[in-house]
């Protein structure tokens, strides 16, 4: 059975056909509508899926935000603008006449990464460190989504009670410090206004402030991982995202995690999928996981 997988992100929409063999075929991409209106998103999704839907038997959506009862929510509703409560599942069912499921994109990516692991792993946590910090938890071989879709939003756990205000409304979240956006926001002086990519480049050139910002991010993530180990007793943590996979970053996280007591140590792995983990994870879940 072929799945029409869709990934809805803040800047792009992607879709592809994924067969039972897990191979991604006929991938297509469009920019996410800037207007944040239901009509614009529906039209964009229609244009994206119309060439593909005749070749699929079901639809699986991985989306930014919180998915609750098939609709789109967010920790900070202002981030969604007019898309708050957008009926993702109902919309795609109407557009395609196919059965449809929807899940948070980081949760979907966690499931894809879990399926790629070797060995007898039943408990793992996936963390993506990119513009924000998100994640997904697999416990006992099952992906945790929670009754309200919130499970795995580990970037919004507390890192520093005196830290910066996070977009979710809390103060001192991991995301506000460790994410690419958090790294850039903390930059001062000649680095003020630089994005995370530039800061990583400057760190590689020996810039002391840039190095300190990246170390702060890595140390914050290591402490989060220690907390996750204490909470879930997971067998491994998989780290992805543009920051998480940046050269030298995971080694820094490992260094800071090693400074924690031994009980909180856990194997760290780089993500298997650099791209399209959300697409693949949603399709894999549609093959047999009850959401």
UniProtKB/Swiss-Prot annotation:
The protein's name: N-acetylmannosamine kinase
EC number of the protein: 2.7.1.60
Gene: nanK
Pathway where it operates: Amino-sugar metabolism; N-acetylneuraminate degradation; D-fructose 6-phosphate from N-acetylneuraminate: step 2/5
Annotated Zn(2+) binding sites: 156, 166, 168, 173
Enzyme class label: transferase
Function: Catalyzes the phosphorylation of N-acetylmannosamine (ManNAc) to ManNAc-6-P.
CDD domains: ASKHA_NBD_ROK_EcNanK-like
Subunit structure: Homodimer.
PANTHER family, sorted: N-ACETYLMANNOSAMINE KINASE (PTHR18964:SF169), ROK (REPRESSOR, ORF, KINASE) FAMILY (PTHR18964)
Catalysed reactions, semicolon-separated: an N-acyl-D-mannosamine + ATP = an N-acyl-D-mannosamine 6-phosphate + ADP + H(+)
Binding annotation for ATP: 5-12, 132-139
Family: Belongs to the ROK (NagC/XylR) family. NanK subfamily.
UniProt keyword terms in alphabetical order: ATP-binding, Carbohydrate metabolism, Kinase, Metal-binding, Nucleotide-binding, Transferase, Zinc
GO MF: ATP binding; N-acylmannosamine kinase activity; zinc ion binding
An annotated GO BP: N-acetylneuraminate catabolic process
SUPFAM superfamilies linked: Actin-like ATPase domain
